[in-house]
Amino acid sequence: MGKRLQSQNRGKGTPRYTSPTHKRKGAVKYRKFDESERKDKIIGTIIDILHDPGRSSPIARVRYDNGEERLILIPEGMKIKDTIECGISAEIKPGNVLPLGEVPEGIPVYNIETIPGDGGKLVRSGGCYAHVITHDVSKTIIKLPSGHMKTLNPMCRATIGVVAGGGRKEKPITKAGKKYHAMKAKAVLWPRVRGVAMNAVDHPFGGGNTQHAGKPTTISRHTSPGRKVGHIAARRTGKR
């Protein structure tokens, strides 16, 4: 009898496949959407800039005028002791948080809410940004980094600017150990071994004198877990 596949082991759940979230600095999201932001603005000061393992961008600790502290995603060009404004009357400049309905068309934004007050869900990776395309009476249309157009409530908040950390991929990873530790921070199993390179006991495509699958690579959605590898329930394969 063969061994369990990686997908079967992952489903069981072990420390090898568990993301080390205990090393994270904390939740990174907007403060509560209260009356101070709905009617005016609140000012905060960046008191520290932190590295968060498993996150592709630096984060900042912000202290607001009311004494509240939060972790936020910062844009390119921000530094310690800089101030940010949060609210409907905030100025249009990098780092400030406003409802989408108050952001002019063509301005880059990030950390966008999908529901007013949810803290920010979209466009949070280092170097990413979306564009405000157009406004309507009860909706705002934004263009995501993928090119997809999304319609949102104009009271959903977003931050002006581009997420910091965009140049992280410009420096090449020249050693396998560097890549190993980078993947370890996100619980990604690396390196990824091809099925045809494994022994027959480890994978349905393994074994043999030459590296070939030896059986159909397109498999049913309802097949047994130990055979579910390759193109699962594929409508078509190959070039389009």
Curated annotation (Swiss-Prot):
GO cellular component entries: cytosolic large ribosomal subunit
Recorded GO MF terms: rRNA binding; structural constituent of ribosome
This protein's UniProt keywords: Ribonucleoprotein, Ribosomal protein, RNA-binding, rRNA-binding
SMART domains: Ribosomal_L2 (SM01383), Ribosomal_L2_C (SM01382)
Region (Disordered): 1-33, 204-240
Basic residues bias spans: 21-30, 224-240
Keyword RNA-binding: yes
Pfam family, any one: Ribosomal_L2_C
Subunit structure: Part of the 50S ribosomal subunit. Forms a bridge to the 30S subunit in the 70S ribosome.
HAMAP family: Ribosomal_uL2_A
Function: One of the primary rRNA binding proteins. Required for association of the 30S and 50S subunits to form the 70S ribosome, for tRNA binding and peptide bond formation. It has been suggested to have peptidyltransferase activity; this is somewhat controversial. Makes several contacts with the 16S rRNA in the 70S ribosome.
Protein name: Large ribosomal subunit protein uL2
